[in-house]
Structure formats: structure tokens, C-alpha cells
Amino acid sequence: MGIDHNKRLKEHLYYYSARISRDISNLIKWLVLAVITGCIVGAASTLFSFTLKAVTGYRKAHEWIFLLLPLSGLVIVFLYEKLGKEDGGTNQVLSTVRSRDDVPILSAPLIFITTALTHLTGGSAGREGAAIQLGGSIANQLGRWIHLDEEDRHVIVMCGMSAAFSALFGTPMAAAVFALEVVSVGVMYYAALMPCMIASLVASGFAAGMGVTPESFHVTDIPALTIESGLKMGVVALGCAVVSIVFCIALNGAAGLYGKWFKNKYLRVVVGACLVIAVTFILRTNEYMGAGAELIEKAVEDGQADTFAFFWKMVLTALTMRAGFRGGEIVPSFCIGATFGCVMGNLMGISPSICAACGMAAVFCGVTNCPITSILIAFEMFGFKGVSFYLIAVSISYAASGYYGLYKDQTIVYSKYKAKYVNRHTRL
């Protein structure tokens, strides 16, 4: 009897010691991989940030270069045809996380160069989508080099996404959660939480140490939460949900029209560039070139935005991105949300500054279907003083924006409206 008891005790001790040893080794493995990924992707994203800052500064100092937008478009199409095969963009990264698809290593230098060309010549495009592709491509290649299995490669790609997002924006909390949340709406990849958070923090710290300034804005005139202010913010949030839907439809519609009328990619990008130039000349402003950071700052910090600024940013982004230029739609969605929210705030008699901040988070939520990320972005960029309004804006926008989204490979696993498994792709 005593012998059997001792034997069982030894078996239990062996089992638990082996289990603890396995868990510790797995923890150490992902700590090391996350730090390595954060450093490598952080370095690449820092260089990317400095490059975009340099080309944007050059464009502002030499406004004539905007007329070279058709030429840069031709170069971009040529590079992708000769080197990049078919570009899946951010969708390809999301597909890699969920399936056996790969992000080609060539995606990293291609998206770097072509996004810089787009910003140099004044296309209306963002940078975060490009950074996610950059980080995903580098991390995927790192996973191949060290012979990670399929499941671990999915996690390291998510680490790369988080690291790139964090390095550019300086928002490590939002960046870590974004990678977990964006692939499948309603399901969080918690197995990747620790490595994504570590990679995000390392990349953010690396970028900050190299001189990349984290994005932050000062929100003014934050009102007390009352029934009146809460209802007004609810109306702003509903408007933002509608705007996010219209933005997704505009992007998809522009892609459809370009594809229908201009089968040749070279002709398509030239026509798109000429349309962007024409609209810009008609508007007589260069504020809509690039990501729109100046419009965001003006809306949030000064409470000022032209009435139709959100509309024109939407139009020019759709014309630019769907013609074949590179960059991303995330920062333009920030700009659209901030300017729309600011206008709504002025119309409704509530602080345009807080409405711009809430609009930015709400439209981002509407186009990405990532409510937790959206709330964290608001916290990290605007501070915690307006927390009640951020929660109202993001939650209402998430529910009211339906199943639309920027990414066709994003899956809505569970319904937004009831505890129901739906497993469907987003509408574009």
C-alpha cells in the first residue's frame, strides 16, 4: 500500500514538474522571440517613420512635386508587377494569422518604398496599414528562419503587427490588443497576448529612444457627463458609424469602378492620380495630402474643421488607395472621424475638441471592428479625462456600423447583436 502511494506520488511529481518545466520554457521562448521581434520590427518601423517624415517635409517644401503623382503611380505598379506578384496588403497579413498563407519577404521593402513614393507625391494615404504589412512580413520571415511551426508562426506575425503599430504611434496597449482583435471579431487570440505586449513595448521603447515622438493630443473643454451631454455624444457616435460605413462603401465602390473602366493597371493608376490632382486643385488646398495629421491636430486641439473636410478626405483616400497607391486607410479614418466629430460638436453645442477625439476613435472602430483597441487608442492618445465619452462613442459606433470593414479577410465570428455564432466575412 505504501509502495503504491509512493509510486503515485512520484508519478504526480514527475507529471507536474514536466508540465511546469514545459510552461517555463515556452514562456522564456516567447519572451526572447518577442524581444527580438520588437527590436527588429521596431528598427524597421523607426526607419519607415523617419522616411515618411522626410519625404513629407520635402513635399511641403517643393509643392510642384505633387504633379509627379501619376509618375510615382506608374513606378509603384511596375514594382509590384515585376517583384511583388499580387499584393494582398493587410488582408494577406490577416490571412497569414488565420491560415497557412505566407506574407512574402518582398512585401516589406515593397510596401516601404511604395508608401514613401505615395507620400512624397501627395497621395491621400496613411501609414499604419503599410506598417502592419511591414511588421507582418518581417516577423513571418523571422519565423521561417528559425523554423517555427505553423501555430507559432501565426503568433510571431501578430507580434510583428503589434510592434509596427506601436513603433509608429507610440501606443503599446492599443497595438498589442489590435493584433489580437482584428483577425476574428468576437474571438481574442489570448495565447498571443504576452508576446504581442512584450513586442509592442520593446518596439515602442526602441522608436522613442531613436526620436520617434508618440502620437498624443490635448483635448480641451471636456464637459461633465450628464444626460444631455451623453445623448449628444450618442448622436455623434451614430453619425460616426454612418460615416464609417460610407467610407468602406466608398473604398469598395472606387475599386469596382476603377476595375470596370480601367482594366490596365498602369492606366488605372494614372487616371486615379489625375483625379486626385484635379480635386486638389479645385479645393485649392494641400491639407488632404498624406495621412491628414494636421487636420486631426487642428480638429482635436483647436476644435476647428471645415464642414466638408471629412467628405473630401474620404473621397481623396478612396481615389488614391484604390487606384493602386500604397499606404493604408487607418490614419485617414482617424482624420475623417476627427473632422466629422469636430463639425458635429460645433453643430450640437458640445465641445468640438472632445467630439473630434471621440469621432476619431468611433470611426476607427467602425472600419476595423476593434472596440477594445479603439478605446485604448483614445486613452493613450487623449488621456483618461474623457473616458465616459470614449466609451459611449466607441460602443455605439461598434454596434451601429454593422458588418462593414476595411479588410475582406477579417472574420466576424460572433454576432454584434446577440450571443450567436455567425462566422462571416466583413462587408466592403
Where are these regions (language model features)?
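Alpha-helical transmembrane segments and immediately membrane-proximal extracytoplasmic
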Residues: 1-428
